[in-house]
Every structure is written in C-alpha cells, then in structure tokens.
Amino acid sequence: MKAITLLSSGLDSVAALAIAAESLEIEMAITFDYGQRAGQREIEYSRKVCEHYGIEHIVIKLDWLAGITNTSLVNRGEDVPALSFEDIDEAAPAAITEASAKAVWVPNRNGVMLNIAGSFAESRDCDYLVVGFNGEEAGTFPDNSMAYVEAMDNAFSYSTQNGVRVLAPLIELGKTEIVKKALEVKAPLEYSWSCYHGEETPCGGCESCVRRARAFKNTGTKDPLLERLGV
C-alpha cells in the first residue's frame, strides 16, 4: 500500500514517517511553507529526512495563509510564549498551555494541509496520508485528535474517489513514548526540528522545545539533534 506523508521535520512527523515506512511504500513527502518562523529550517531538515529515506520531497507555499495569520508562529511582531517543564505538567493549570496553543494557532492549518495532500494522494492512487498527530498535543490542539482523524476520513470518503485515509501512528502516544518509538525504528532525529523559531539552534524555551526536552530527559537519552549541533 502507498502513502504520502505530511512532513514538517518535527519530532512527531519524522517519527510517524519512520514508523509508516516500515510497512508502507512512501510515495512522497509534502512540506508546507505558510510563512512560519521556522519555515526555512523545516524545509532544509525535511529535505535531509527525505534524502535519508530516498523519497520525493516537494514544498508547497501557502502565502495567503501567512497573510491571514496574526499569531506569533507567523507574525514576528508577536512573542512566542516561553514555557517550563512545570507549565506543561499535568498538575499545571490548563490555562497555561491553552494560552500557548492560542498564541501559535494558524487558521484551519491542518484542514488546509490535509485537503491539499489528499488531492496528491488521490492523483497518485495512494491509500494513506501519514501525519504526526499524537495524544499529548490532542488535549490543546483538537485537530491532533482521533476524532479529527475520523472526521477527515469521513470527508475524504466523499471528496476522493479512492477513499484516502489519514494514518496517525502516534495518535495514542505522548512525547516520551514517541521518542522511544522513534529511536527504536532508527528515525533520523538528528534532522528533526521542533522549535517554533528558525535560528541556528533550538531556543529551548518554546512549548515545542520544552515538550521535546522533557521527552528525551524521561527516556534518559541525549537528543541527537543537539548532539549534532554541539549544543
């Protein structure tokens, strides 16, 4: 069976690709450029990941999405929230992570990306779209949830002739479990970029960096990306 993967080069999308590649033929990977701060870094690292797996890589620009997004993931005039391990703990007030999610939200981003990728999947007669949706982020990002996957599958049953489906191999996993699984399948995590910023090295303070750091700490392993960068 064949699949197309949505690849941002983040921990989750790289792990999902690595897992899917064990049982599916990955036809291509799509990276979206919607003006995000880390866009060029994501494109660079996604290209490296695709070279590792020997798969086709395309980049789709969504300038119009950048134009209507006012939150800090795209708008350089807004500050990206900085969080700590305590802020993302289950005992912490939910309002902290909810505010962080709101600050980096991009209007209907996953819906737009999945529908574009669905067109490619149908045109190439691919069965699946592989995504990095996971259990840890589903609480604050509803478009990472199983309910959303099922809703998209239902929509694709109407909008694609071959019934493209969304495959989310991490849907029940937290970040710690994702790191363990990624290491197990030898995912090229040295070229996975999670940071909301696009500097030479990860900031270490945005929510994505903090969740990644906690996951590696919990597994007792060093982050291959930081090792490669000498951080």
Curated annotation (Swiss-Prot):
Coiled coil: none annotated. It holds the Pfam family QueC. It comes from the Archaea. ATP binds at L7, S8, S9, G10, L11, D12, S13, V14, A15, A16, L17. Its cofactor is Zn(2+). InterPro entries: QueC, Rossmann-like_a/b/a_fold. Keywords: ATP-binding, Ligase, Metal-binding, Nucleotide-binding, Zinc. It catalyses: 7-carboxy-7-deazaguanine + NH4(+) + ATP = 7-cyano-7-deazaguanine + ADP + phosphate + H2O + H(+). The keyword Repeat does not apply. Binds 1 zinc ion per subunit. It is an enzyme of class 6 (ligase). Pathway: Purine metabolism; 7-cyano-7-deazaguanine biosynthesis. One of its GO terms (molecular function) is zinc ion binding. HAMAP family: QueC (MF_01633). Catalyzes the ATP-dependent conversion of 7-carboxy-7-deazaguanine (CDG) to 7-cyano-7-deazaguanine (preQ(0)). This is 7-cyano-7-deazaguanine synthase. The gene is queC.
